Amino acid sequence: MTELNINFYSVSKLDPRYSKTLCDTTNKRTKKSVDFILDLMCIKDNDLTVDVKKDWFENLINKLKTMKSQMMPGMEHYNTVEYLLGRLNFIAYEIDWNLDDVKMYVGYWD
């Protein structure tokens, strides 16, 4: 199994010292599943922190919704898509795009 850590956090534009973790999606998954997630998010490197833009975030959620609608339980990556969609929808309610700079940390270990 591969340890995958995707951590979203926000830094308030009102007070940059204030940071809160929106969601930590740490999980043990197969290497194939981790590669699928990283490819889906267009992430090429290990241990990477990136700025998250609203358009990118919303496009990712829409891409996952479309994928899920075309899958059936038991299909390859169905559980991964369902899991990610649930976590990202949870994060979406926590973000105020007008006040927060959102960052995503990604790391994984074999």
Show which residues each predicted segment covers.
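Acidic (Asp/Glu-rich) sequence patches and key acidic residues
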Residues: 1-110
